């Protein structure tokens, strides 16, 4: 029996490496040799420290003890019967939710919002990409354009795709002043994508000066401010002659969400991308009287994720430039500890050829 090394998250801020059997693809499945696998903030929040549940199902933790990693990218090395659209040797990224395929949300191309039986997230309710090989459904695959690296693909499969959907929902265009609050990996990508869409001016806000410096270094931000700066909504209003046309909150923080709302121009769009938490505001004074719109955006669709990959190629923008730390699978414990510290940009686990 051929075996492989795989990483599990038992909780208590630890990583467990195990030797397990290499899976065999069944009908409509492929076996992928992993090349790069990202670590997402949700892995840290919901699994790494402790196995969390949602308010809707408080007695059922989201993580069900599978191989972790929901940002996988690699190369197909074997295929089961019934596969028709891909071939061995194809470089692919994997949409990180495998949906039922038949519910209204799956029909719209959004497996993330699947309401049918059998919905499973790679790395949470089925084996994910923190292993030498990944078993995936052919329907969940997206072909990686030649110009993009495996690291780019891993980042696209969740973080970049999430930012891309927010940019689309916010209808960012060349006439827009864009504000991004929270410059973690998703926020950094939101600025990069806003740049690709031709945004007139891009403003970033974060608690950490290191993240502002990184955004400047990447060339994706025109103006950056610490979140502790006094009077930020007024400063942004003066800079933009009335406020941001589009504000994207990627912080998931109550203060960040309120800042995004209050810094938006009349008739502007506010997109909430960051997960968890709450926000409180005056409905009349902060929203209605300014004719502002609030839009919720959760991950993206298969179609938009594929379009995102091609847009990045056309715009010559490379998500890998925001990766600050790379680890081997054997170093997964160090990778998660660093990601949990917040003292980094994007973190990936890479695999040898």
UniProtKB/Swiss-Prot annotation:
Residues annotated for Zn(2+) 1 binding in this entry: 40, 70, 158
Database matches in InterPro entries: ADH-like_C, ADH-like_N, ADH_Zn_CS, GroES-like_sf, NAD(P)-bd_dom_sf, PKS_ER
Record's cofactor remark: Binds 2 Zn(2+) ions per subunit.
Keywords tagged on the record: Metal-binding, Oxidoreductase, Zinc
Broadest EC class assigned to this enzyme: oxidoreductase
Binding of Zn(2+) 2, residues: 100, 103, 106, 114
Gene Ontology molecular function: oxidoreductase activity, acting on the CH-OH group of donors, NAD or NADP as acceptor; zinc ion binding
Coiled coil start-end: none
Enzyme Commission numbers on file: 1.-.-.-
Cofactor: Zn(2+)
Family the entry assigns: Belongs to the zinc-containing alcohol dehydrogenase family.
Protein name per the record: Uncharacterized zinc-type alcohol dehydrogenase-like protein YphC
Species of the source: Escherichia coli (strain K12)
